[in-house]
Curated annotation (Swiss-Prot):
Descriptive protein name: Flagellar assembly factor FliW
Pfam family, one: FliW
GO cellular component: cytoplasm
Keywords: Bacterial flagellum biogenesis, Chaperone, Cytoplasm, Translation regulation
SUPFAM superfamilies: BH3618-like
Subunit text: Interacts with translational regulator CsrA and flagellin(s).
Annotated GO biological process: bacterial-type flagellum assembly; regulation of translation
Location, primary (coarse class): cytoplasm
InterPro entries: Flagellar_assembly_factor_FliW (IPR003775), Flagellar_assmbl_FliW_dom_sf (IPR024046)
UniProt lineage: Bacteria, Pseudomonadati, Spirochaetota, Spirochaetia, Spirochaetales
Length: 130
């Protein structure tokens, strides 16, 4: 994932539902392997993690245009995160949005929310197996 403790990223298109928020920081969380994606000028934050932490074979088929929008050409620039839903009573019910991952160019500090074209992924993928 991201190495530094807290890094600011520009999201020129914002995040779906939060299009007016263009700047976020990503910082470590006390709940590993999760991080916090926090807006710098609004009280909005998301819990995020790499989908590969719980689904090693994740293949979202991100459109090349999405990577181009954040100027990510090389594989070592690209990071994929997913938003986590923890508003549950039991940790086994925690879900991840695999349908609309956050993609980041970690060298240019740009990000966007992409739409995954692989139909097998959903907005509410269970993170923990029972």
């Amino acid at each position: 994932m991201i190495d530094e403790k807290s890094i600011e990223f520009d999201f020129p298109e914002g995040i779906l539902g939060f299009e007016n928020i263009k700047k976020f920081i990503i910082k470590d969380s006390k709940y590993k392997p999760f991080s916090i994606m926090q807006s710098i000028n609004k009280d909005v934050s998301f819990l995020v993690t790499s989908p590969f932490n719980f689904l090693s074979e994740y293949l979202p088929n991100i459109q090349e245009k999405d990577w181009s929008d954040i100027k990510a050409k090389e594989e070592d620039e690209k990071v994929i995160l997913c938003i986590i839903n923890m508003h549950v009573n039991d940790y086994k019910d925690i879900t991840a949005n695999l349908k609309a991952p956050i993609i980041i160019n970690k060298k240019k500090l740009l990000g966007k929310q992409a739409i995954c074209t692989n139909e097998k992924y959903s907005l509410h993928h269970k993170v923990f197996k029972e």
